[in-house]
């Protein structure tokens, strides 16, 4: 469940000031202060700090309280200081140093607070301290603080900020060379830039060193070599190796290990081994780092056995594996399904006295999660804590990712809460995992996670928006997907192939092929190269729309653009031809596929078998099936189900059961469609007892029935009671009219008779099915029976099914009550139903009830932009309910909702044209 976050201040349009814009203004003001030492005032960093996010609304009260405490003697013994120390943040310290504080006290306090294990200075707190010290004429200690500031960089932004500040100090003539950068400072700065891969900035700093006539040393050159090698740019790195020799210096082990790393980054292992083998010849001992780089390179290339051989040879070279060496191998073995070998290495590691570190444990936890061994993963997390190792964000993310991939979102949320309870903040990756997980079942909850990200000032990235766009598209919310695309652009994020692939694929699946084609045609102008997935989606879309000729033209266009089709592309066309009854052409296309070097897949055979069976050509269909087996192409559940469905349709249940037996013999598990086909087959023959036997087999194998399975069983029970219905009335409508609660009770009793005890999932699917056919009266009775007689609490899916059914039947008061009940138990109502409900209430003149429902939705943690999109713009706005549009907009503003600039503009423009 998405928990409600406190409403934010509404500022209408939102925006941010670029860090670079702020940096440009950094030293724009001079203030001269009289002093016994001749000096000029150094500009405060406070303008920059004002643009940084504050951690608390009362962040300025903390610095003033600190100033009051520090102005007294023996301040370090103050009980008030000790009571507030855990709440002091770097932003508070930055603000404190910008106040009228004695510089010596500031230095002492800086040292005192840094002794607190929970506190870490930021580059901004150090910058504020530097400003204070420089303005008071300090020199020697400034060099020390500047080095500490450089070393404290935690991000690219920090590194660029520090670089700009150091340049200002270095070039400001007012300081009369007192604060010029010396070799140690230059090297530390290079090291900081190298950590974040800022090689262009490193090169500029190197050139500035030369301009300042500061002579580079071996450490300088090695940092340059290492910086380029981290990015795999060995050519540029080798230029600095040449400079080492030109300077009369000798490359050392750091130089060579960097080169080995660089070649491994480029996957040029031959060159890496060449450097490795030359090291002893150059009088340079090969160390553990060199070995580990090579072992890592071999592992990345999936040459794990060679990596293990090199690992064994380390001891012959009097080198001993480090924790990183072991971890690299353990990770690779885990990723190659060689987990027993990985565990043996962990055991060997501990026996040799090398303790696994956080990264080692993270690798093992990730591996256990990939095997769905979550209990063992949690045990390992506990072991870490017992051994005094504090899991980091990456460790928790491994668990969160594992849970989300298996649809266990609530467990993932529990891990996030555990992580936060240990003073670790979720990062972009954490939220991205949650968003991906929620998108599989409830995109509105995923949007709520985006809301939380923005609240906490965690920046969404391309992956965030791609996942949300994909989720909205899969839910059929294309308007929301397009708006997210615009928001993405507004935030300076560039949509990539994945963004558009998802949209094009979903549009095609929703039979909006022309719209998908228009989007596809716009990609060249956007600088995005169409890929095989996009072409395949369009080809499949045209085929499913019965436009096989257009699909062929798209294939030709694909080939003309040198985009090679894959087996999925051909399968889409073969399926289109088969659906059109053109089996001969489909077979010829299969032959063409083989000629260009693409082997037919299981899906290819299954598509052709399906057509043969549809044409009644059982012999050729079975012959192709046998060819699959003899050629080593293993038929899948879909292949077997194709036969079973056809046999059931023909009333040949013995043949269907025979195919089920073959399926099990060949190690293929029947799926939902397989069992449902058999249930329908027996039901159509009036053999309902056999149908319930199949339901029992289904449950025993762990395959949960769907709502359609239960509808099928209800249909057969009704047919036994009333006979088969004839006439023009659609089957679902007929079932809805005939179904009574007694029929559902009979179904439940039959389930118990056949040892299929109804559980929460059974009731959930049953209610979903009954709501789908529009029988709200029976659905409500089953809903009550489930709670009162079985003690089962309704799931969010059940509530939303009832809500949707109420809305479709225009029972708005009942729908409003369902919304109230959902919110009361912490469930999230589907926005599409809420849109229909609120519009319905306003149209009936019940605007107070409509406003009340909307007010309640604001407390649920939805992404506020999405609420505005779905309810106000696409709901009451497009329905021509102008008064409701402005009323609901006003409600959001009064509740402190904060919109993106794009959404705010749409709201200001007023209701869109009515449709």
Swiss-Prot record:
This is Pentatricopeptide repeat-containing protein At5g65560. Gene3D superfamilies: Tetratricopeptide repeat domain. PROSITE patterns: PPR. It comes from Arabidopsis thaliana. NCBIfam families: PPR. Keywords: Repeat. The lineage of its organism: Eukaryota, Viridiplantae, Streptophyta, Embryophyta, Tracheophyta. It comes from the Eukaryota. InterPro entries: Pentatricopeptide_rpt, PPR_P_subfamily, TPR-like_helical_dom_sf. It holds the Pfam family PPR_1. Belongs to the PPR family. P subfamily.
């Amino acid at each position: 469940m998405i928990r409600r976050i406190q409403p934010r201040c509404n500022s209408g349009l939102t925006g941010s000031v670029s860090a670079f814009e702020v940096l440009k203004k950094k030293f724009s003001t001079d203030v001269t202060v009289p002093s016994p030492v001749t000096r000029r005032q150094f500009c405060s960093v406070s303008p920059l700090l004002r643009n940084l996010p504050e951690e608390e609304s009362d962040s300025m009260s903390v610095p003033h309280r600190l100033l009051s405490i520090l102005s007294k003697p023996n301040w370090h013994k103050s009980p008030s200081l000790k009571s507030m120390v855990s709440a002091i943040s770097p932003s508070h310290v930055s603000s404190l140093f910008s106040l009228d504080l004695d510089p010596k006290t500031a230095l002492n306090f800086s040292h005192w607070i840094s002794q607190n294990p929970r506190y870490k200075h930021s580059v901004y707190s150090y910058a504020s301290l530097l400003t204070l010290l420089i303005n008071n004429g300090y020199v020697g200690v400034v060099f020390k603080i500047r080095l500490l500031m450089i070393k404290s960089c935690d991000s690219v932004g920090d590194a660029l900020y520090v670089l700009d500040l150091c340049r200002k100090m270095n070039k400001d003539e007012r300081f009369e060379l007192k604060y010029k950068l010396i070799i140690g400072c230059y090297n530390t700065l290079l090291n900081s830039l190298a950590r974040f891969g800022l090689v262009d900035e490193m090169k500029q700093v190197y050139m500035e060193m030369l301009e300042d006539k500061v002579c580079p040393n071996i450490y300088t050159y090695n940092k340059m070599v290492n910086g380029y090698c981290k990015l795999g740019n060995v050519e540029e790195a080798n230029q600095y190796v040449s400079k080492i020799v030109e300077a009369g210096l000798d490359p050392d082990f750091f130089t060579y290990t960097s080169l080995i790393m660089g070649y491994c980054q480029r996957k040029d292992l031959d060159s890496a081994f060449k450097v490795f083998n030359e090291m002893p010849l150059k009088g340079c001992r090969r160390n553990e780092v060199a070995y580990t780089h090579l072992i890592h390179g071999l592992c990345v290339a999936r040459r794990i056995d060679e990596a293990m051989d090199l690992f064994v040879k380390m001891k012959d070279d009097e080198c001993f594996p480090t924790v990183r060496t072991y971890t690299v191998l353990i990770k690779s073995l885990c990723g190659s399904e060689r987990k027993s070998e990985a565990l043996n290495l962990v055991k060997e590691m501990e026996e040799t006295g090398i303790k696994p570190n956080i990264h080692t444990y993270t690798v093992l936890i990730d591996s256990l999660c990939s095997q769905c061994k979550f209990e063992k993963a949690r045990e390992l997390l506990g072991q870490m804590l017992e051994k005094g190792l504090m899991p980091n964000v990456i460790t928790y993310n491994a668990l969160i990712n594992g849970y989300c991939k298996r649809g266990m979102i609530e467990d993932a949320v529990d891990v996030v809460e555990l992580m936060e309870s240990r003073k670790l903040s979720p990062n972009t990756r954490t939220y991205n995992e949650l968003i991906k997980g929620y998108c599989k079942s409830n995109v509105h909850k995923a949007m709520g996670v985006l809301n939380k990200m923005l609240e906490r000032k965690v920046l969404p990235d391309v992956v965030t928006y791609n996942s949300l766009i994909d989720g909205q598209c899969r839910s059929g919310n294309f308007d929301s997907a397009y708006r997210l695309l615009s928001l993405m652009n507004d935030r300076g994020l560039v949509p990539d192939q994945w963004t558009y692939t998802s949209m094009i694929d979903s549009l095609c699946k929703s039979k909006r092929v022309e719209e998908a084609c228009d989007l596809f045609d716009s990609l060249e102008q956007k600088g995005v190269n169409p890929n095989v997935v996009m072409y395949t989606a369009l080809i499949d879309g045209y085929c499913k729309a019965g436009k096989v000729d257009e699909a062929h033209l798209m294939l030709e266009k694909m080939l003309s653009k040198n985009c090679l089709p894959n087996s999925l592309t051909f399968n889409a066309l073969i399926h289109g031809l088969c659906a059109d009854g053109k089996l001969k052409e489909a077979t010829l296309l299969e032959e063409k596929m083989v000629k260009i070097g693409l082997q037919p897949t299981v899906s290819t055979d299954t598509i052709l078998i399906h057509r043969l069976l549809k044409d009644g050509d059982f012999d050729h269909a079975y012959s192709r099936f046998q060819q699959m087996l003899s050629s080593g192409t293993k038929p899948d559940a879909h292949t077997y189900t194709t036969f079973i469905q056809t046999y059931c349709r023909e009333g040949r249940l013995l043949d269907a059961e025979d195919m089920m037996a073959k399926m099990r013999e060949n190690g293929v598990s029947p799926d939902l469609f397989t069992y449902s086909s058999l249930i329908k087959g027996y039901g159509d023959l009036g053999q309902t007892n056999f149908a319930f036997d199949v339901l029992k087999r289904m449950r025993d194998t762990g395959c949960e029935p769907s709502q359609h399975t239960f509808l099928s069983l209800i249909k057969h029970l009704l047919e036994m009671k009333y006979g088969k219905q004839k006439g023009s009335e659609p089957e679902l409508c007929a079932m809805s009219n005939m179904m009574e609660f007694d029929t559902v009770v009979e179904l439940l009793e039959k389930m118990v008779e056949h040892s299929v005890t109804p559980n929460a999932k059974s009731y959930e699917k049953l209610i979903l099915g009954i709501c789908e056919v529009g029988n709200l009266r029976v659905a409500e009775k089953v809903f009550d029976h489930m709670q009162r007689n079985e003690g089962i609490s309704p799931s969010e899916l059940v509530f939303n099914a009832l809500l949707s059914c109420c809305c479709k039947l225009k029972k708005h008061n009942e729908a409003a009550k369902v919304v109230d009940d959902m919110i009361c138990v912490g469930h999230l109502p589907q926005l599409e139903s809420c849109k229909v409900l609120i519009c319905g209430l306003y149209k009936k003149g019940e605007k107070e009830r409509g406003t009340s429902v909307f007010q309640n939705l604001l407390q649920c943690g939805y992404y506020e932009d999405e609420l505005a999109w779905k309810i106000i713009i696409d709901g009451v706005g497009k329905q021509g309910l102008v008064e409701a549009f402005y009323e609901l907009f006003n409600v959001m503003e009064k509740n402190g909702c904060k919109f993106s600039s794009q959404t705010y503009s749409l709201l200001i423009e007023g209701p869109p044209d009515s449709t």
